[in-house]
Regions:
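A charged N-terminal "starter" segment
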Residues: 1-124, 130-143, 166, 181, ...
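Active-site loop/helix belt of alpha/beta enzymes
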Residues: 3, 139, 151-202
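Short beta-strand segments
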Residues: 61, 128, 144-150, 195-197
Length: 202
């Protein structure tokens, strides 16, 4: 996988993003502003896509950049969109994402948010706490789910520790078998997979 060079360059007496002069962008939109280069987005996405096996699906995490134009662009070329709130769910739907291609992950999901996405339609929900599981049980709406757990021996060299001990980001590994049994016992929950971070920020 290669990292794209910066699209910003000085050419023909002007600073440009790709072939678009910054002076023209400022004249049209004023400042301050954010400008995104679609060519760079595509280049980075395609580079990652080519580096991974075909069996791996790519999801764009809306929290990385919720700009509607960026989300719409990735909704068209990525396998799906990952959301972390009901607000991001609405961004995904407005971006044209198919409901089966929306994945709800992240700690702190409220019962109201879970009901909101279930009523609207969702591809998959990642369960990260007993409270979330209890809410899904009580709502009684069929949905694909995965269980997020923290491996007993996780790496600890980064800014965030996401393995090794219980945390808000999933179940302790010692509770995994029990949690799997609990999910499988609920008729309207379809266990689709497991979610884990083998290290930090990976």
């Amino acid at each position: 996988m290669t990292i794209a060079h910066s699209p910003i360059a000085y050419k023909d007496g002007q600073w440009r993003i790709s072939e678009c002069a910054l002076s023209e962008i400022v004249a049209e939109y004023s400042t301050p502003l954010f400008a995104y280069d679609r060519h760079t987005l595509d280049s980075q996405f395609n580079s990652l896509r080519q580096a991974l096996p075909d069996v791996v699906d790519l999801y764009y995490s809306i929290k990385a950049n919720p700009n509607p134009a960026v989300v719409s662009h990735f909704a068209a070329c990525a396998a799906g969109l990952e959301i972390a709130s009901a607000a991001e769910y609405e961004i995904a739907r407005n971006a044209g994402a198919q409901i089966e291609n929306i994945l709800f992950a992240g700690p702190g999901k409220t019962a109201e948010e879970l009901e909101h996405v279930l009523r609207g339609g969702i591809g998959e929900i990642h369960i990260e706490s007993s409270e979330e599981l209890a809410a899904l049980e009580s709502l009684g709406i069929p949905v694909n789910v995965s269980i997020r757990f923290n491996p007993a021996s996780g790496a600890s060299g980064g800014a965030m520790r996401m393995g090794g001990k219980p945390s808000p980001f999933g179940f302790d590994e010692e509770l995994l078998a029990e949690t799997v049994d609990r999910v499988r016992a609920v008729e309207h929950l379809n266990l689709h997979g497991l979610h884990m971070f083998a290290g930090t920020q990976l």
